UniProtKB/Swiss-Prot annotation:
Organism domain of life: Bacteria
Major subcellular site: cytoplasm
Name of the protein in question: ATP-dependent protease ATPase subunit HslU
Localisation per UniProt entry: Cytoplasm
GO BP: protein unfolding; proteolysis involved in protein catabolic process
Similarity comment: family membership: Belongs to the ClpX chaperone family. HslU subfamily.
Amino acid sequence: MSEMTPREIVHELDSHIIGQQKAKRSVAIALRNRWRRMQLAADLRQEVTPKNILMIGPTGVGKTEIARRLARLAKAPFIKVEATKFTEVGYVGKEVEQIIRDLTDSAIKLTREEQIKKCKFRAEEAAEERILDALLPKPKEDWDSEKSDGSATRQIFRKKLREGQLDDKEIEIDVSAPQAGIEIMSPPGMEEMTNQLQSMFQNMGPGASKRRKMPIKEAYKLLIEEEASKLINQEDLKEQAIELVEQHGIVFLDEIDKICKRGESSGPDVSREGVQRDLLPLVEGCTVNTKHGMVKTDHILFIASGAFQMSKPSDLIPELQGRLPIRVELDALTAGDFKRILTEPHASLTEQYIALMGTEGVTIEFTEDGIDSIAEAAWQVNERTENIGARRLHTVMERLMEELSYEASDKSGSVTVIDAAYVKASLDNLVQDEDLSRYIL
């Protein structure tokens, strides 16, 4: 797991997300607390539960982006899910326990990658020997294997193989044949049963090998994977992955405001209040049965987020509100924020368009007043129509660059300066006309 300090986490998030310091600090503290908890004595560690977070803010201000970036920093099992995808147990749709099953699958993948790294050297050696055996088959006579391995010819070929001189040469090798996939049609909500049936049928088949002809470079990669998988103990892998989920797992619940109960609705609300009730045991702590084993959710961190434009946090059922003790409000974006978004983040929008046009040999230069005008145009459209936050910049930029993108292949070697006048000529009519803005921007 990540050992970054809160300050380092915020600094890393700053290079991708503008503003929203409160939200960044909250997730940074929550992530660091995971590390702090693991430094405690075992009996005290069991008592320290994560403080789940609820992020509240309008659409397009960075809630989901914080989750995406956090996933890369966490170095722990992480899953982002939409709360609207789930329904109450017994109805058509995904059950909330699928969240933990998916989280466990991601932990299995993470753990396998770590174990492959540890045994990569041994796997590379074994793969190298198999390729040399294919290149230099041993004579049928019962020669001493050590003498054969150390022969001058074998060492010459080993040197050439390591230097990449044999990469394009084709060889025939025996590789594990992929198990035939068995597709089982099942109704929504029955995914777990389907997975168990599929794994049962696949395990019934013998582990056959197949002879294939391929370049040495491709064969080497394939054999490394095959040899590494032989060195990994599958039972240990599952145990480590489950431990990783239970102690370090993070679940990001997006669009949680969409499962708030509507005041005017009547009858069962299977995709709203029912889902909230089903989420309660997960967030509070329960045991979920997965195909890899039983997973306890007591110490999994839940971060929920929602725009809450049509509802408010108090519309969530009280029990769920109590399980999300830390509330963070994200600020709406201003024209100044838009300007910073266009220039400051790593791989900003302006950098992306400069690089894209550069592939056609076209040079683009954004002036200071040009960027100001783009930011102002996006902010104005958000104020007059629906406020979709920073996503409006994508729409405005695409409209601004449309003509240039279309003609770029015919303008190789040209230089285009995007200043306030260029932006005004391209966008002014659309920004001023509210009806056009509604449909085009």
